Regions:
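Long, low-complexity, charged/polar intrinsically disordered regions in eukaryotic proteins
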Residues: 1-26, 30
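Long, charge-rich, low-complexity alpha-helical segments
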Residues: 22, 35-99
Length: 99
């Protein structure tokens, strides 16, 4: 099965969740399936970005600008995080319309 999220995808936090920010982290309660999710500092940064629809490549670029991380590691970790958030129904994904 191909990945759901690519660098060309647009992602946005679902409206069916409640989140709370704490110092350096965020916790999310997914109302669709009753899932509870906790994110570290970088995950919280990503979560803040996906409150509005944003292309995954733009999220990657923002992380690279904000944190010291290798490009390839940033990309793979970001895609894994977004896949996990999608699996827990915490984000909605719009694929590249050209595909």
């Amino acid at each position: 099965m191909p990945p759901l999220v690519s660098l060309d995808s647009t992602v946005v936090a679902t409206t069916e969740q409640i989140s709370a920010h704490f110092t350096g982290s965020v916790v999310i309660l997914g109302l669709r399936v009753g899932s509870y999710y906790s994110l570290d500092e970088v995950g919280a940064f990503v979560w803040s970005l996906v409150q509005e629809p944003l292309q995954v490549s733009d999220i990657r670029d923002a992380i690279l600008e904000e944190y010291e991380v290798e490009h390839a590691r940033c990309e793979s970790d970001l895609l894994a995080l977004l896949e996990d958030l999608a699996a827990n129904q915490l984000i909605d994904i719009e694929s590249d319309p050209r595909i």
